[in-house]
């Protein structure tokens, strides 16, 4: 895969962004099933909604495209939140809801020795890593993570003791 970087001190135009995304997607000419994983509404001002709209517009004419917002343990997005973040062009039927209590499956464990090492001894327990089962089922030709979707532990309330 060719990496594509955009930089401009004055800002990157929507047309330049779409051009770069078309260049990226052009590297995968035979896509039939695509999963896009943007952040949820708690990151509505991240530009991930706009990027997801562009991806859907480019991919949906020739592939089945699903959008599964990375909810973590947050509440599912309602229709108004989806429209606010992703616009009207992506149909409700394209959205999948991540149910963290039922859909997460274990994929491995971060060993206690490693957590002790990287935390300088401040934390010393193993951590089980889980992902949504859809990531591993083999249905999708391409899975795209959009925006700041990063793994993190559930250790407290956001903007508080987390």
Write out the residue ranges for each language-model feature.
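N-terminal amphipathic/basic leader segments beginning at the initiator methionine
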Residues: 1-16
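An acidic, phosphate/nucleotide-engaging active-site surface
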Residues: 77-157
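A generic structural motif
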Residues: 62-73, 94-101
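Small-residue-enriched flexible segments
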Residues: 2-6, 154, 161-162
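Histidine-anchored nucleotide/phosphate-binding helix
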Residues: 43-65
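A short, gly/pro- and small-residue-rich
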Residues: 54-58, 156-162
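Short glycine-rich or small-residue beta-strand-to-loop segments that form or flank ligand, phosphate
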Residues: 33-44, 66-72, 143-147
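Glycine-rich phosphate/diphosphate-binding loops that line cofactor/substrate pockets in enzymes
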Residues: 20-35, 60, 139
